[in-house]
Amino acid sequence: MENFWSIVVFFLLSILFILYNISTVCHYYMRISFYYFTILLHGMEVCVTMIPSWLNGKGADYVFHSFFYWCKWTGVHTTVYGYEKTQVEGPAVVICNHQSSLDILSMASIWPKNCVVMMKRILAYVPFFNLGAYFSNTIFIDRYNRERAMASVDYCASEMKNRNLKLWVFPEGTRNREGGFIPFKKGAFNIAVRAQIPIIPVVFSDYRDFYSKPGRYFKNDGEVVIRVLDAIPTKGLTLDDVSELSDMCRDVMLAAYKEVTLEAQQRNATRRGETKDGKKSE
């Protein structure tokens, strides 16, 4: 009987191995499932290992620095320009474009010291992830309750100055898988202006050369080019300037996004030995 089940297990594993290598869709589902499983396991780990950092008010430093190594198996390589701009002392609001759950991997490559994340409140109910987020001093915001959202803005501005923290925000407010940027929401800019602290724009290149949820593919290799732009001061600005500030940040980030995406595509092609038309070079 034991031999029978051994044969069944071997047969099923063989089928999965074959499907993984011949079916793009199966390959996608297996890799993305294992990626989410990695997030779950990492969340369980940091529920314990993050406690000392949490007690010292160090933000999410350990969470992201360790997650970078947990995800080495993905084959995704990151190239970072301007890393030192995120490591400066003092509070700041870090804004970044939002594409998919793979953003966590990109964030891990460049995580600023003493930085926390702002997330939508619904994520506070994801098992283990929520505990890891709590120990990372994550700030949850209820986007559908204006009164609570505004209270969170005031709380963030106060805490960041008092504890010398940086805050990572996705100003688009939701994932954008279609390329480019959708209009920015004003929360991050309200916080920066209220606290009179600088904004540090971070731009991730487009992932669609190696990953796409609608396209159902997640290739074994991928290049992400990350660029940190110069900090944008907010001293002297008022809430009346928020709309103009938001548009200006979006414009400079969008220009950088086009440049880093082109570089990432070229790096991917070189890595795979492809010519400009996408064919393998001889």
Swiss-Prot record:
Keywords: Acyltransferase, Lipid biosynthesis, Lipid metabolism, Membrane, Phospholipid biosynthesis, Phospholipid metabolism, Transferase, Transmembrane, Transmembrane helix. It is an enzyme of class 2 (transferase). The chain crosses the membrane at residues 4-24, 32-52, 122-142. SMART domains: PlsC. GO terms for biological process: CDP-diacylglycerol biosynthetic process; phosphatidic acid biosynthetic process. Pathway: Phospholipid metabolism; CDP-diacylglycerol biosynthesis; CDP-diacylglycerol from sn-glycerol 3-phosphate: step 2/3. The keyword Transport does not apply. It is a multi-pass membrane protein. Pfam families: Acyltransferase. Disulfide bonds: none annotated. It comes from the Eukaryota. The keyword Nucleotide-binding does not apply. Its EC number is 2.3.1.51. A motif (HXXXXD motif) lies at residues 98-103. It is found in: Membrane. GO terms for cellular component: endoplasmic reticulum; membrane. GO terms for molecular function: 1-acylglycerol-3-phosphate O-acyltransferase activity. InterPro entries: AGP_acyltrans, Plipid/glycerol_acylTrfase. It catalyses: a 1-acyl-sn-glycero-3-phosphate + an acyl-CoA = a 1,2-diacyl-sn-glycero-3-phosphate + CoA. PANTHER family: 1-ACYL-SN-GLYCEROL-3-PHOSPHATE ACYLTRANSFERASE. The HXXXXD motif is essential for acyltransferase activity and may constitute the binding site for the phosphate moiety of the glycerol-3-phosphate. Belongs to the 1-acyl-sn-glycerol-3-phosphate acyltransferase family. Converts lysophosphatidic acid (LPA) into phosphatidic acid by incorporating an acyl moiety at the sn-2 position of the glycerol backbone. This is Putative 1-acyl-sn-glycerol-3-phosphate acyltransferase acl-2. It comes from Caenorhabditis elegans. The gene is acl-2.
